[in-house]
Amino acid sequence: MAREYSRVDRIGDQMQRELAQLIQREVKDPRVGMVTVNDVKVSRDLGYADIYISLLSTEELTEDSPEVQDSLTVLNKASGFLRGQVGRAMKLRVVPHLRFHFDKLLGQSRKMDRLIREAVGDKPAVPRDDNDDPVSDNPERDA
């Protein structure tokens, strides 16, 4: 019977917090923009950890954007340093190899949101009728 919150899940969550702080404080390369660590998926044998990141930007970014490619290159090259720091912070005997990926989910959710707004337009979700208000502050109306 599988547990709801396994050790691998707990390690992934803790790695996400540690990596977010390390990238913000320790990685000094200017090619790395404002990185957000969205998710960490750790393999069952703790051999690998896939880290999904997104970048803060004013424009829509894709995996092929130069900013994204530069950030991924720097982070993958710094993965050995980051792996050592994570291992020391978490006191793990076996520290997974880190693989950084661009998280496409944010772009897909923005696209879905835009499509929904275009389909719905300016229509309110529920038409409102002031006469159907069950609670009234007007005592004359209640009398």
UniProtKB/Swiss-Prot annotation:
Q: Cite a GO CC annotation.
A: cytosol
List the keywords (alphabetical).
Cytoplasm, Ribosome biogenesis
Q: Name one Pfam family in it.
A: RBFA
Cross-referenced SUPFAM superfamilies, in alphabetical order? Ribosome-binding factor A, RbfA
Q: Which domain of life is it from?
A: Bacteria
One of its GO biological process terms is: maturation of SSU-rRNA
Alphabetical list of InterPro entries matching this protein: KH_dom-like_a/b, RbfA, RbfA_dom_sf, Ribosome-bd_factorA_CS
Concerning PROSITE patterns, the annotation shows: RBFA
One GO MF term attached to the UniProt entry: ribosomal small subunit binding
> Does the UniProt entry include the keyword Cytoplasm?
yes
List the Gene3D superfamilies hit by this protein, alphabetically: 3.30.300.20
Q: What role does it play?
A: One of several proteins that assist in the late maturation steps of the functional core of the 30S ribosomal subunit. Associates with free 30S ribosomal subunits (but not with 30S subunits that are part of 70S ribosomes or polysomes). Required for efficient processing of 16S rRNA. May interact with the 5'-terminal helix region of 16S rRNA.
The subunit field of the Swiss-Prot or TrEMBL record says:
Monomer. Binds 30S ribosomal subunits, but not 50S ribosomal subunits or 70S ribosomes.
What family is this protein classified in?
Answer: Belongs to the RbfA family.
Protein's recorded name:
Ribosome-binding factor A
Species source reads Marinobacter nauticus (strain ATCC 700491 / DSM 11845 / VT8) (Marinobacter aquaeolei)
